[in-house]
Amino acid sequence: MSQVDINHARALVYQLLSSLFAREVDEQRLKELTSEAAQQFWEQLSLEANFTQSVDKIRSTLNGIKDDEALLELAADYCGLFLVGTKHSASPYASLYLSGEDEPLLFGEQHQQMSEFLHQSKLQVQSHFPEPADHLAVMLAYMAHLCCHSEDSVQLSFLQTCVDSWLAKFINQLTQCDKNGFYSAVATLTLAWVKQDIAQLEPA
């Protein structure tokens, strides 16, 4: 497999993880995530020991959705965890975990930093996703872009500074709130993937 192929595969994983944080799983997305191709992808990903437990939870949840009610319950989990903004939720914004302030503000320093990164790459947050730029979904989508368009050193710096720096705190908050465990598994997989990617990108 060439380096181009490897980077493309890495980008696909980041895009997948980004999509799961960007919006709830609807009927069309469920079909995609449980298709034969997706099952092969999950199977391949689960072969890595650090990913196995999280991938198994994600697969069992998705494959276990057999009716609209179960799909709505997963959508309710997404809403309750990421959209409500209470102490019983885990808002996926870097600024809430990296700011030293007692009452960190949305659209703060991390948002401004991400907005500048996007601007430099001639990218922007899509209009149908009205969220601050330091939303985890935006950061993972940007990393997918970097995989195919930037030097390893740029990718490494972004992962260490902007993603890995707060993911563990986010997961700690998320696991306290996530009764069903699906999104905790997605977040834990994300952190494990980021850690592995950092190790691969670091110079020998």
From Swiss-Prot:
Entry's localization field: Cytoplasm
Domain of life: Bacteria
Keyword Nucleotidyltransferase: no
GO cellular component assignments: cytoplasm
Gene3D superfamilies to which the protein is assigned, alphabetical: 1.20.120.1820, HscB, C-terminal domain
Main location: cytoplasm
Keywords: Chaperone, Cytoplasm
The keyword Chaperone is annotated on this UniProt entry: yes
Coiled-coil blocks: none
Swiss-Prot/TrEMBL GO biological process terms: protein complex oligomerization; protein folding
Role of this protein: Involved in the biogenesis of TorA. Acts on TorA before the insertion of the molybdenum cofactor and, as a result, probably favors a conformation of the apoenzyme that is competent for acquiring the cofactor.
Family: Belongs to the TorD/DmsD family. TorD subfamily.
Name by which UniProt lists this protein: Chaperone protein TorD
Organism expressing this protein natively: Shewanella baltica (strain OS223)
Lineage: Bacteria, Pseudomonadati, Pseudomonadota, Gammaproteobacteria, Alteromonadales
Gene: torD
